[in-house]
């Protein structure tokens, strides 16, 4: 940001928040509505984005949080396992042109019924990659709590395997 490069931030939920939200849904019902489930488990990203934006504004960097429906980021497929199909760029481009840093929720989008949907676990990384692709970003830098790319979340699945080499196209799958 200080170097005057245009930056887009994509945030996941803070550590443990998504798992806590999933646990809360299970306490309510073992047959939770998939649409409501996605609405609940995607709320951690909203909190993170607002906190990041608040901090950036506090230190003098113009920013605001963007929820997936505000961008919008369109998805297709089942709840809990949707995939990004399109991202409308105009609002974000206009905000960047005004000198702002957009902080966009990862892990989520909106479907054809205008309902929030979530991507699979690790979806914030996938969101960042797709946003980088749509905006033709020079780079996509991912900061994460694990070193490297794994077949699944190594914090949840002990048998997750680290992938030594992966193409940009494979990351988008």
Model-identified regions with their sequence ranges:
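Nucleotide/pyrophosphate-binding catalytic subdomain
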Residues: 1-173
């Amino acid at each position: 940001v200080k170097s005057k490069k245009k930056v887009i931030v994509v945030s996941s939920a803070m550590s443990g928040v998504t798992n806590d939200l999933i646990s809360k849904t299970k306490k309510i019902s073992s047959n939770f509505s998939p649409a409501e489930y996605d609405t609940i488990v995607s709320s951690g990203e909203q909190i993170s984005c607002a906190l990041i934006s608040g901090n950036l504004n506090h230190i003098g960097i113009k920013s605001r949080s963007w929820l997936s429906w505000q961008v919008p980021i369109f998805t297709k497929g089942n709840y809990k396992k949707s995939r990004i199909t399109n991202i409308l760029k105009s609002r974000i481009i206009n905000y960047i042109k005004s000198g702002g840093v957009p902080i966009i929720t990862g892990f989520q989008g909106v479907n054809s019924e205008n309902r929030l949907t979530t991507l699979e676990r690790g979806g914030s990384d996938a969101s960042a990659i797709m946003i980088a692709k749509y905006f033709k970003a020079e780079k996509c830098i991912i900061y994460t709590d694990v070193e490297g790319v794994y077949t699944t979340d190594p914090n949840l699945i002990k048998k997750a395997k680290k992938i030594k080499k992966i193409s940009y196209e494979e990351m988008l799958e």
